[in-house]
Amino acid sequence: MANKTVEKTNPDTFLKEMNEVCCTKVTEEDLKDAIEDEYRVMYSRDGKKLLKASFSFRKKKYVVREGTEVICDDAFRQCGSLQSITIPNSVTSIGDFAFYLCESLQSITIPNSVTSIADYAFFSCESLQSVTIPNSVTSIGDFAFCRCKSLQSITIPNSVTSIGDNAFWLCKSLQSVTIPNSVTSIGDNAF
């Protein structure tokens, strides 16, 4: 994502500009101007935000468009047929609940461009067996992988400093966790 200077002058203007820079929330304006791909996945007009997969989304494998920078909150929420997703290196943010209840999702590689894993990002992805967390990630959010019942092992890279509350709670198959010395904060019921 390119650097952008935001001046704090008018509070309304400031909030609007901050939303454009870093927000993973979908706005009414985003939806009004959205474009839809052949699989009924909506993107912002400029292609930088993946907004939402439609309720009729039934793909087993999906490749996020190159140039996408943000996978918004709830983007693939409850897409029960999704088994595999390819995320390009252009993505810097994965929003809250982005893959919430994607019960068929089996594996995911998070690109080196992502710096944090948001709250509930992969909550209850019950078929998720493997996750690759890159060295760019510094924090793992609350409930990020909670109820990923098939997850067997996880290696947390040296870049991570905090693991949120319930991040890996109810991961019943989890047998091995490697936590580096860089982690200074582990939330309640993290494992």
Regions found by a protein language model. Name each.
Residues 72-75, 95-98, 118-123, 141-146, ...:
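Consensus positions within tandem repeat domains that build extended binding/scaffold surfaces
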Residues 1-48, 54-70, 80-93, 103-116, ...:
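Structural signature of tandem-repeat unit edges
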Residues 40, 52-54, 58, 98, ...:
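Homeobox/homeodomain signature
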